[in-house]
UniProtKB/Swiss-Prot annotation:
GO terms for molecular function: ATP binding; serine-tRNA ligase activity. InterPro entries: aa-tRNA-synt_IIb, aa-tRNA-synth_II, aa-tRNA-synth_II/BPL/LPL, Ser-tRNA-ligase_type_1, Ser-tRNA-synth_1_N, SerRS_1_N_sf, SerRS_core, tRNA-bd_arm. Residues 1-26 are annotated as: Disordered. It comes from Beutenbergia cavernae (strain ATCC BAA-8 / DSM 12333 / CCUG 43141 / JCM 11478 / NBRC 16432 / NCIMB 13614 / HKI 0122). ATP binds at residues 261-263, 277, 348-351. This is Serine--tRNA ligase. Homodimer. The tRNA molecule binds across the dimer. Catalyzes the attachment of serine to tRNA(Ser). Is also able to aminoacylate tRNA(Sec) with serine, to form the misacylated tRNA L-seryl-tRNA(Sec), which will be further converted into selenocysteinyl-tRNA(Sec). The lineage of its organism: Bacteria, Bacillati, Actinomycetota, Actinomycetes, Micrococcales. GO terms for biological process: selenocysteine biosynthetic process; seryl-tRNA aminoacylation. Its EC number is 6.1.1.11. It is found in: Cytoplasm. Pathway: Aminoacyl-tRNA biosynthesis; selenocysteinyl-tRNA(Sec) biosynthesis; L-seryl-tRNA(Sec) from L-serine and tRNA(Sec): step 1/1. Gene3D superfamilies: Bira Bifunctional Protein, Domain 2, Serine-tRNA synthetase, tRNA binding domain. It catalyses: tRNA(Ser) + L-serine + ATP = L-seryl-tRNA(Ser) + AMP + diphosphate + H(+); tRNA(Sec) + L-serine + ATP = L-seryl-tRNA(Sec) + AMP + diphosphate + H(+).
Length: 423
């Protein structure tokens, strides 16, 4: 949820943010009008309630002959107060409905535009020249099947399209990746957490995942619970309605969880293999930070992501995501995309978002200041490793015979294996 006070003071910032996202800037004006109506009606209700209390006291002090008239007046005022409260509640509901549609304010410097308007910040590593090496690279699914590591046919048989099994070397490779990610997180001072994958509606809504992209989320209607698409959701809810201590710096958690996504808007995209699937595993970084420290913490999360990409020796690029491609909670997002040889394109492997106070304001997560007051904190998140990395590791490190070289940084997590080769 955005800061209404800040929006009242500088509505042009909100309008500019909406335009950069490709959203309706008039939402800001409708929101401010609803806010003004609510505040006026709330003030009227509170004034009438105070007068009602005075009348109640007056009843007890009234002379016997005056008491019936005073009682009638008090009864009439009670009805007016009840009506005024209902008016204020309706205005609050209208305001809340508009607030739920208003995304976070985009940070300064974020490129405007949509999905294709990102800015490339840098390239790291050089893609292999397979033609110069004298062979045509196989895609990750062919490699995975030859290694008996990926089984999409049985995944589809058991669960439907976009499901799969990781078996043998595939399962070991994923566990190696995720354990390497946890070790990286521990070294960086994160507390590892195995999170719930089912959350309440208020937690899912508080993180911003029930807005425009609600169709991407699995819901268990009988229990009114949602399956998370990232442990970010559970970690954001971890300190909901709490005051956290940030006096020693950010609170950092690394969540390991299964993740579930409906991919409702992805019909026909990445249908081969395990690039875009309904279920996968991920280690997610999550930080609670002071607002003034959030931008620096965002750069730290990005740096830790890049360290892990270098550990597995992938050529990649870093992009500054355009405003129209940000989630509703994010003020800024950096993506790391690794080179995918068989498709000759970059594939997103990590993203890290600075959500400023947007999620914490909705979820009631605050810090106490020196003067005793409280304020919302900033929340940030970033992918450290996920199942999708297997795609790029197999393709970038393949040998002509279909075996796959294990990057040196992963070898300790695979029992010293230097190659993945079908037994």
């Amino acid at each position: 949820m955005i800061d209404l006070k800040a929006l009242r003071e500088n509505p042009d910032v909100g309008r500019a943010s909406q335009r950069s996202r490709g959203e309706d800037p008039e939402l800001v004006d409708r929101l401010l009008d609803a806010d003004a109506r609510h505040r006026a009606l709330l003030t009227s209700f509170e004034q009438q309630r105070a007068e009602q209390k005075e009348l109640s006291r007056a009843v007890g002090k009234a002379a016997p002959q005056d008491r019936p008239a005073v009682l009638a007046h008090a009864k009439s005022r009670a009805e007016q107060v009840k009506s005024a409260e209902a008016d204020a509640d309706r205005a609050r509901a209208e305001l809340d409905a508009l607030l739920s549609r208003m995304p976070n304010i985009v940070a300064d410097g974020v490129p405007p535009g949509g999905e294709d308007d990102y800015v490339v910040l840098r390239h790291e590593g050089t893609p292999r020249d397979f033609a110069a090496e004298g062979f045509t690279p196989r895609d990750h699914l062919e490699l995975g099947e030859r290694l008996r590591a990926i089984d999409t046919e049985r995944g589809a048989k058991v669960s439907g399209a976009r499901f799969f099994y990781l078996t043998g070397l595939g399962a070991r490779l994923e566990l190696a990746l995720l354990n390497a990610a946890i070790d990286k997180a521990l070294t960086a001072g994160f507390t590892p957490v195995i999170t719930p994958t089912l959350v309440k509606p208020e937690i899912m809504a508080g993180t911003g995942f029930l807005g425009a992209h609600a169709e991407e989320v699995y819901r268990i209607e009988k229990d009114d619970l949602y399956l998370v698409g990232t442990s970010e959701v559970a970690l954001a809810g971890y300190h909901a309605n709490e005051i956290v201590d940030l006096s020693d710096g950010p609170l950092r958690y690394a969540g390991w969880s299964a993740c579930y996504r409906r991919e409702a808007g992805s019909h026909g995209k990445d249908t081969r293999g395990i690039i875009r699937v309904h279920q996968f595993h991920k280690v997610e970084m999550f930080s609670y930070a002071r607002l003034e420290d959030a931008a620096v913490e965002h750069e730290r999360l990005l740096a830790w992501e890049e360290e892990l990409l270098r550990l597995v020796e992938l050529p990649y690029r870093v992009i500054d995501t355009a405003a129209g491609d940000l989630g509703s909670s994010a003020a800024r997002k950096f993506d790391c995309e690794a080179w995918l040889p068989t498709q000759e394109r970059y594939l997103e492997l990590t993203s890290t978002s600075n959500c400023t106070s947007f999620q914490a304001r909705r979820l009631g997560t605050r810090e106490r200041l020196e003067d005793g007051s409280t304020r919302p904190v900033a929340t940030l998140n970033g992918t450290l490793a996920t199942t999708r990395w297997i795609v790029t590791i197999l393709e970038n490190h393949q040998n002509p015979d279909g075996s796959v070289r294990v990057p040196a940084g992963l070898q300790p997590y695979l029992g010293g294996l230097t190659e993945l080769r079908a037994s």
